[in-house]
Design a protein with these regions (language model features):
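Ligand/substrate-recognition segments at binding pockets and active sites
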Residues: 1-70, 111, 137-140
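Short, solvent-exposed loop/beta-turn-alpha elements that line the ligand-binding surface or hinge
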Residues: 4-10, 54-59, 80-107, 137-168
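Short, structured coil/loop segments at alpha-helix boundaries
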Residues: 19-23, 95-96, 110-114, 145
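Extracytoplasmic/secreted proteins, especially bacterial periplasmic and envelope-associated proteins
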Residues: 24-28, 32, 50, 74-77, ...
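N-terminal cationic-hydrophobic initiation segments that often serve targeting/anchoring roles
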Residues: 34, 56, 106, 125-126
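N-proximal short alpha-helices
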Residues: 71-74, 78, 87
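Short, charge-rich amphipathic alpha-helical segments embedded
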Residues: 128-131
Length: 168
């Protein structure tokens, strides 16, 4: 529909990833894009230091596999990286409507205003502009007794037991 029926004459896209990334997952994505879109992707593995240089400094890439761990329990820990003026905006994404929604959310504590604004920003980022393609989120493996109550997981694989108790 976009000028490349069945992916014909679509340029091969290069997808950069480090040796530490989950190679089988990216190979599965490569296969899905080929089967469903007719698009060829070349996977290029790099050592971490050159990858970071290409990704953050040179910004010489079309697609790259990266990850981010939220520092706090709020959507802005992820969405805030993509405002046009953020030093973390490695994609160089710029969208005034997105920036405006994030700004609106940052100016209030009223969740009835914040959350709809953040949902609109997320829609712009992922659905409308397709700047990022979230593939998965990490869920650490945990063995926990059903009797242990009120344990809270916080970012960076830490657990808060301050209010925990054992049910009899």
């Amino acid at each position: 529909e976009a000028g490349y029926p069945n992916g014909e004459n679509f340029p091969v896209l290069e997808f950069y990833l480090t040796f530490n990334n989950d190679i089988p997952m990216f190979e599965a994505v490569q296969n899905m894009w080929k089967v469903n879109l007719g698009i060829d992707i070349k996977l290029t593995q790099m050592e971490f230091a050159p990858f970071i240089n290409k990704f953050r400094t040179e910004r010489d890439y079309t697609m790259a596999g990266t990850s981010w761990t939220g520092s706090y329990n709020d959507p802005t820990t992820f969405l805030g990286m993509f405002v046009s003026y953020s030093y973390k905006n490695h994609s160089l994404f710029t969208n005034k409507a997105f920036d405006d929604e994030i700004l609106l959310a940052s100016k209030t504590i009223d969740q009835n205003i914040r959350m709809p604004a953040l949902h609109r920003a997320e829609k712009i980022l992922i659905e409308d502009e397709a700047v990022i393609i979230p593939i998965y989120y990490y869920e650490p493996p945990v063995l926990k007794s059903p009797k242990l109550k009120d344990v809270f997981y916080i970012p960076f694989a830490q657990y808060k037991f301050s209010y925990s108790y054992l049910e009899k």
